[in-house]
Swiss-Prot record:
This is Zinc finger protein 69 homolog. GO terms for molecular function: DNA-binding transcription factor activity, RNA polymerase II-specific; RNA polymerase II transcription regulatory region sequence-specific DNA binding; zinc ion binding. It comes from Homo sapiens. Residues 1-39 form the SCAN box domain. It holds the Pfam family KRAB. PANTHER family: ZFP14 ZINC FINGER PROTEIN-RELATED (PTHR24399:SF75), ZINC FINGER AND BTB DOMAIN-CONTAINING (PTHR24399). GO terms for cellular component: nucleus. One of its GO terms (biological process) is lipid metabolic process. Residues 76-147 form the KRAB domain. It is found in: Nucleus. A zinc finger (C2H2-type) spans 271-293, 299-321, 327-349, 355-377, 383-405, 411-433, 439-461, 467-489, 495-517. PROSITE patterns: KRAB, ZINC_FINGER_C2H2_1, ZINC_FINGER_C2H2_2. Keywords: DNA-binding, Lipid metabolism, Metal-binding, Nucleus, Repeat, Transcription, Transcription regulation, Zinc, Zinc-finger. InterPro entries: KRAB, KRAB_dom_sf, Znf_C2H2_sf, Znf_C2H2_type.
Length: 526
């Protein structure tokens, strides 16, 4: 009769009876009276909040069905990863596998104990701690001993790669605690009419959770074998749901459906920048990002004093001082300080030019080359000389121009010691000593030291006169000839004599004028 009565009850009532009054589950009349009272709306708890607290404590002391005890914890964690060997199998293991087995088993057991699992010490752990051989007695049964041993060795190796972490075990304990509190709270909700008691219980549960997390963080703070300080941070976030019921009485439930959906309330914690709202998965990445906003540069080069916001940037910079070039081209052996420079260099071998100008379809191997090229279409010259106001498309052209004002000539010829303000000028000059003429005309075979000279020469074969005067229509093959012609119209005389101050339109005219002064000086001496 009692069992049949339990079957006819609603699921919630049947579960509550088995949990709350196991003795009454076998009694007919008392059971039916209690259940009838509960569903007619009478309060099963006529005591005050202290009675409810006492009942909660008694429920916590009971072994709730479906929740792991110390024994089940051992079965679900340690015994699942434990591997048993017979005496024969243990003897066949290589010393390296025996040592690996000892390390894995002892580490997993230590992690279980450190996060608070209450379990008796397995015999295999005692044997390993004493230095004894941890083999078990022979087990009768079918199977190939050699294949069984092979699978055990593979299990040891895979387990060594993924030993049970303290944080993972702690999350399991927290889930069990949440499920237990969930059942306790659900029971109180069903049998109590005191809403304020329920709310206080909910606050107590959340306070217990917060305290458990703080305790866990303190527990796992330790010093590893390398002397580094390790703090394991829990990434489990507990969500609190508020369900509204149709009844006039307000009911707030602290519900975690971890039994049916164990991962639905677990999400990875993220870190958001409160300035630009960018999100990061690791706190160290957020810290590095914040230096963009603060301008902080804590990493300083000891050689030159230059500061950087990231340690990686400092390491890359230091290669300038050490001369280290770790990235080497497999094609030609050329080495680079940066991987990006090597990637750009590879395009010289592959011929790849992924950056294309939208206006003229000219392609470039580097993005910076495309940016500089686009300024020829837009006319932009963003780099201005502070001395004379002249503007340039590229910063290197401005740097070279500034040397005109400073008189700096940092490039010296090793053959004749002549100095130059531009590296290109030195390169061109050195061809005088070497006799190199790398630019050859395909039409007549004539060779030139500079590319501009070859370009000017080609107009002899093509007959093209690309430079035409807007005032008189006269055309010229060379840009230099065109500029000289324009001085006829403008009256410009940039070449001035240092002795008499007379100015000339052409440099050749100034040279002829200097001859007059030299002849006059010679006559005066005679």
């Amino acid at each position: 009769m009692p069992q049949q009565l339990l079957i006819t009850l609603p699921t919630e009532a049947s579960t509550w009876v088995k949990l709350q009054h196991p003795k009454k589950a076998v009694e007919g009349a008392p059971l039916w009276e209690d259940v009838t009272k509960m569903f007619e709306g009478e309060a099963l708890l006529s005591q005050d909040a202290e009675d409810v607290k006492t009942q909660r404590e008694s429920l916590e002391d009971e072994v709730t069905p479906g929740l792991p005890t110390a024994e089940s914890q051992e079965l679900l964690t340690f015994k699942d990863i434990s591997i048993d060997f017979t005496q024969e199998e243990w003897g066949q293991l290589a010393p390296a596998h025996q040592n690996l087995y000892r390390e894995v088993m002892l580490e997993n057991y230590s992690n279980l104990v450190s996060v608070g699992y209450q379990l008796s010490k397995p015999s295999v752990i005692s044997q390993l701690e004493k230095g004894e051989e941890p083999w078990m007695a022979e087990k009768e049964g079918p199977g190939d001993p050699s294949s069984d041993l092979k699978s055990k060795i593979e299990t040891i190796e895979s387990t060594a790669k993924s030993t049970i972490s303290q944080e993972r075990l702690y999350h399991g304990i927290m889930m069990e605690s949440f499920m237990r509190d969930d059942i306790i709270y659900s029971t109180l909700r069903k049998v109590s009419t005191y809403d304020d008691v329920l709310e206080r219980h909910q606050e107590t549960c959340m306070r217990d959770v917060r305290q458990a997390i703080l305790t866990h963080k303190k527990r796992v703070q330790e010093t590893n074998k390398f002397g580094e300080n390790i703090i394991v941070h829990s990434n489990v976030i507990i969500e609190q749901r508020h369900h509204k019921y149709d009844t006039p009485t307000k009911r707030n439930t602290y519900k975690l459906d971890l039994i049916n959906h164990p991962t639905s309330y677990i999400r990875t914690k993220t870190y958001e920048c409160n300035i630009c709202e960018k999100i990061f998965k690791q706190p160290i990445h957020l810290t590095e990002h914040m230096r963009i906003h603060t301008g902080e540069k804590p990493f300083r080069c000891k050689e030159c004093g230059r500061a950087f916001s990231q340690s990686a940037s400092l390491s890359t910079h230091q290669r300038i001082h050490t001369g280290e070039k770790p990235f080497e081209c497999e094609e030609c052996g050329k080495a680079f300080r940066h991987r990006s420079s090597l990637n750009q260099h590879h395009r010289t071998h592959t011929g790849e030019k992924p950056y294309v100008c939208d206006k003229c379809q000219k392609a470039f191997s580097q993005n910076i080359s495309l940016v500089q090229h686009l300024r020829t279409h837009s006319g932009e010259k963003p780099f201005t000389c502070n001395e004379c106001g002249k503007t340039f498309r590229q910063i290197r052209h401005l740097s070279e121009h500034i040397r005109i004002h400073t008189g700096e000539k940092p490039y010296a010829c090793t053959a004749c010691c002549k100095t130059f303000s531009h590296r290109a000028y030195l390169t061109h000059h050195q061809r005088i000593h070497t006799g190199e003429r790398p630019y050859k005309c395909k039409e007549c075979g004539k060779a030139f030291r500079q590319r501009i000279h070859l370009s000017n020469h080609k107009t002899v074969h093509t007959g093209v006169k690309a430079y035409e005067c807007n005032r008189c229509g006269k055309a010229y093959r060379h840009d230099s000839s065109f500029k000289k012609h324009q001085r006829h119209h403008t009256g410009e005389k940039p070449y001035e004599c240092n002795e008499c101050g007379k100015a000339f339109s052409y440099n050749s005219s100034l040279s002829r004028h200097h001859e007059i002064h030299r002849r006059n000086a010679f006559r005066n001496k005679v």
